[in-house]
Each structure stands twice: as structure tokens, then as C-alpha cells.
């Protein structure tokens, strides 16, 4: 798919890469499945960059409008699985 990732230009290159990595995990959750531990590791790093809930919600909404993928639902579902489990969105 072709869409833009929600990026803050005030972030460092490393932070931008980490945020994109998290959204790549969201994509994998919806498309092919992802290991819960890997997903939550990417989300933890995302939260280090975006600690505020309001900003997280805004970024998630921007990504969903662009991609159709609901990051919040992905995080909530993955949280219910053990680290080793492979998780994929239900259709």
C-alpha cells in the first residue's frame, strides 16, 4: 500500500525510524501476523517517543485515515497474548 506515516519533523531520525517500525508492526498485524513480543517491543519504543495519550490518539487517527489500520485495536488485541504467540487481526 502507498500511504504516508504520521511523522513529527521535530523527532530525530532514530525516533522517526522507531515510529515507522511500530507502524510496520501494525501493518503486519493486519496483513500477515506478528509475534506479540515483537509488536509490544515496538509499541514500547513508540511510547518512549510519544508518551502523551492525546498525541498518541492523534497519531493513530492520522495513520488510520491514511492506511485503514486501527493501531489502537491492534495494541489492545496484542496485549492479551503471550510474547511468543503469533497474532493476526480477525477478518
Curated annotation (Swiss-Prot):
Q: Which domain of life, per UniProt?
A: Bacteria
What HAMAP family does the record point to? UPF0223
Indicate the family of this protein.
Belongs to the UPF0223 family.
Write down what this protein is called. Answer: UPF0223 protein SAB0963
Amino acid at each position: 500500500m502507498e500511504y504516508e506515516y504520521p511523522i513529527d519533523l521535530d523527532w530525530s531520525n532514530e525516533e522517526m525510524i522507531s515510529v515507522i517500525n511500530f507502524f510496520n508492526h501494525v501493518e503486519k498485524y493486519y496483513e500477515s501476523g506478528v509475534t506479540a513480543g515483537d509488536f509490544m517491543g515496538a509499541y514500547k519504543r513508540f511510547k518512549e517517543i510519544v508518551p502523551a495519550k492525546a498525541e498518541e490518539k492523534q497519531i493513530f487517527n492520522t495513520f488510520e485515515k491514511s492506511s485503514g489500520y486501527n493501531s489502537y485495536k491492534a495494541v489492545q488485541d496484542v496485549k492479551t497474548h503471550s510474547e511468543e504467540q503469533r497474532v493476526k487481526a480477525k477478518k
